[in-house]
Amino acid sequence: MKLLHIDSSILGDASASRQLSAELVQAWRQNEDGLDVTYRDLAADAVAHFSALTLAAGSTPAELRDAALKHEVAVGEEVLEEFLAADVVVIGAPMYNFTISSQLKAWIDRIAVAGKTFRYTENGPVGLAGDKKVVIVSTAGGVHAGQPTGAAHEGYLRTVLGFFGITDIEVVRAEGLAYGEEPRTQAIAAARRQIAGQFAAA
């Protein structure tokens, strides 16, 4: 089994999403012999945002691409191939200003590729990546799950993953992390129980 582990927090070792996503992946390793893990840190090694250069790279014949266009194509292909190869994707997704980090959005823009993760038909879009399981490690300073303020965070991720055809989506959630030390401790403990319960039921 191949697992793709994505982190997107800018907080380094102080990040709850990084801590919990690492614990989730470690638990998976302990319960899945031969697990092949690919790790991508979108804060430390950011994927360039979708731009005019991206469009130019895709529309320019390979033999006519300069160094910048070749690099743009290589980055997009590498990110997409990692995603397509994975059986499981673990996404560390902290909330910043009511949505996901710009680094995570840049990654999503690179895997949203017509003919690879979705296609359009006369009856509408069809997802092409539905054979995956995705676990979103969702963290937030406030409490937003199930509310309008969370629509551009967990809601957005569910929407775009669903657009890719993915229906097996789970959320490990720790929110209210900015409400004080005790609420933070309780929220992280609850997320850890979710992680433990996921494998206890397996």
UniProtKB/Swiss-Prot annotation:
It catalyses: 2 a quinone + NADH + H(+) = 2 a 1,4-benzosemiquinone + NAD(+); N,N-dimethyl-1,4-phenylenediamine + anthranilate + 2 NAD(+) = 2-(4-dimethylaminophenyl)diazenylbenzoate + 2 NADH + 2 H(+). It comes from Pseudomonas aeruginosa (strain ATCC 15692 / DSM 22644 / CIP 104116 / JCM 14847 / LMG 12228 / 1C / PRS 101 / PAO1). Its cofactor is FMN. Homodimer. Belongs to the azoreductase type 1 family. This is FMN-dependent NADH:quinone oxidoreductase 2. Quinone reductase that provides resistance to thiol-specific stress caused by electrophilic quinones. Reduces both benzoquinones and naphthoquinones efficiently. Also exhibits azoreductase activity. Catalyzes the reductive cleavage of the azo bond in aromatic azo compounds to the corresponding amines. Preferred substrates are the large bis-azo dye Ponceau BS, amaranth and tropaeolin O. The keyword 4Fe-4S does not apply. Binds 1 FMN per subunit. The lineage of its organism: Bacteria, Pseudomonadati, Pseudomonadota, Gammaproteobacteria, Pseudomonadales.
